[in-house]
């Protein structure tokens, strides 16, 4: 550089551009679906985990009904378990009836109300579970009669078949579908919270995205 040449002054705007890290592309929200039976304790724990996941990850969960009663219709099970399966028709029928009359947005709140009574409060009278849950969610008490009406079974079976056909009849609830792949579980107890729930979700997405995984 000769004495007559001036040192170039850096352009502040260029410096700013160089110092600003490249923005990461916005990722799309993942879509998940969980099939549950309110009577199933494992599905209850998995649903609590997915609720935590929704807080810490970009994911939208759709909630759908399946039925342990349908799954075990022809199974060779004990008398005590058969008695439970006979009772378990009630809650899922009521959820189907409520969703038909009031929309799918009532499925999750009704499940939450039923599950809290069955699994946390240990209420064994399912008619009571149904009546109290309908009142909590603000739905008509008359929906309770659906628990003992078979006219809702066709819709229940369709929802059940849609989930179970993705994983096979050798599994029960819960069934979780992610990005076109479905599998039993994951069953986690206790349900992880916060970032721990998010990390499990990350791992679930990883394995679900592996070709041939089931």
List the predicted regions and their residue ranges.
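N-terminal acidic, proline/glycine-rich, low-complexity intrinsically disordered segments
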Residues: 1-14
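Short metal-coordination and nucleic-acid-contact micro-motifs, chiefly zinc-binding Cys/His arrays
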Residues: 28, 36
